[in-house]
A protein has these predicted regions:
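Transmembrane-helix signature of polytopic, lipid-linked glycan biosynthesis machinery
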Residues: 194-213
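Membrane-interface alpha helices of multi-pass inner-membrane proteins
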Residues: 41-69, 87-100
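Membrane-interface helix-loop-helix junctions at transmembrane boundaries of multi-pass membrane enzymes
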Residues: 170-195, 232, 240-241
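Membrane-interfacial loop-to-transmembrane alpha-helix junctions, especially the N-terminal start
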Residues: 31-43, 83-90, 181-194
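Hydrophobic/aromatic-rich transmembrane helices and adjacent perimembrane loops
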Residues: 17-21, 210-233
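Single conserved hydrophobic/aromatic residue that forms the stacking wall/gate
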Residues: 1-10
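Membrane-interface transmembrane helices that cradle and orient dolichyl/undecaprenyl
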Residues: 24-39, 75-78
Length: 243
C-alpha cells in the first residue's frame, strides 16, 4: 500500500543521523590509533559533516558530531587547554563540512537550473533561525528546549534525572576526595559537548519548535555526555585506588 511505502521512507529518513553516528563511532573504535597518530581527526569530522548534510534533511544532525566527540574524549586524555582546542577544531571541521555541503548544493542548483535557489536558501536560513513567536532569543530558546523535552516519555525524564544526579554526586565525591585536578581536564570538554544540543536548539529555534517531533533526538548528545562524564570519573577513581 502507498501509505506503508511512505511510512517506510519516513522511518529511513529518521534513521539517517543515527546510522551515520553508529558508523562514525565504529570507525573510531577500529581505527582510533591511526587517526590520532596521523592527525586525521579534523578530516574525519569534516567527512562526517559532509555526509550528514548530504543524506539528512535537518532532522537531528548534531548527534553525528556530539556522540563521536564523547567517544573521542573517552579514548584520549590530554591537558585541559589541548582538549578544548581539539573540541573547537573538531566542531569547526564538522561545521565546515556540514555548511559547505549545503552551500555547494545550493550553488550547483542555482548555476544549473537558474531557479534562484541561493536566494531561497538565504530566506530559509533566516526563517529557521528566527526567534519563536516574537520572543527574545534566549527566552524563546528555553521555551523550545521545553517543547523538545516534552517529546520524551515520562520514564525517559526520570532516567535522565537519575543520570544527572549520579553525575553530580560523583563530581562532589571527587572534589571531596581531592581528585578534581586529576580529572577536570577530561571532564571539561565533555561538559561543553553536553551543551551543544541546547545551543543548537537556541540557534535554530524556529525549526526546532516546528519539528520538535524529530528534533528532540539531538538531546541524546547530552545523555551521551552525561554517561561519558560518569565513566571518566569512575575510571579515574579506580585508577587512583590502584595507585
Amino acid at each position: 500500500p502507498r501509505s506503508r511505502g511512505l511510512g517506510d521512507v519516513y522511518k529511513r529518513q529518521m534513521s539517517v543521523c543515527w546510522i551515520l553516528t553508529l558508523l562514525a563511532v565504529e570507525y573510531m573504535l577500529l581505527h582510533h590509533d591511526r587517526l590520532h597518530e596521523k592527525g586525521q581527526y579534523p578530516e574525519f569530522f569534516l567527512i562526517i559533516g559532509i555526509l550528514t548534510s548530504y543524506f539528512d534533511f535537518l532532522t537531528y544532525p548534531i548527534t553525528t558530531l556530539g556522540i563521536p566527540l564523547c567517544c573521542y574524549f573517552l579514548l584520549e586524555n590530554d591537558r585541559a587547554w589541548n582538549n578544548i582546542k581539539k573540541l573547537i577544531g573538531f566542531c569547526a571541521s564538522w561545521g565546515i563540512g556540514y555548511a559547505g555541503m549545503w552551500a555547494a548544493k545550493w550553488v550547483i542548483a542555482d548555476l544549473t537550473l537558474h531557479t534562484g535557489t541561493i536566494k531561497d536558501a538565504i530566506w530559509s536560513i533566516i526563517g529557521r533561525t528566527e526567534a519563536i513567536g516574537g520572543r527574545p532569543r534566549m527566552n524563546g530558546g528555553f521555551y523550545v528546549i521545553g517543547l523538545n523535552l516534552h517529546e520524551y516519555p515520562v520514564y525517559m525524564g526520570i532516567a535522565a534525572g537519575i543520570l544527572a544526579a549520579v553525575a553530580v554526586g560523583l563530581m562532589v565525591m571527587i572534589i571531596v576526595m581531592g581528585r578534581w585536578k586529576n580529572v577536570y581536564a577530561q571532564l571539561l570538554p565533555v561538559v561543553v559537548t553536553a551543551a551543544i544540543p541546547f545551543a543548537w536548539i537556541i540557534a535554530v529555534q524556529h525549526h526546532s519548535a516546528l519539528h520538535a517531533r524529530f528534533t528532540f533526538r539531538i538531546l541524546s548528545v547530552a545523555a551521551a555526555a552525561a554517561i561519558t562524564f560518569i565513566v571518566l570519573i569512575v575510571r579515574n577513581v579506580k585508577k587512583c585506588q590502584k595507585n
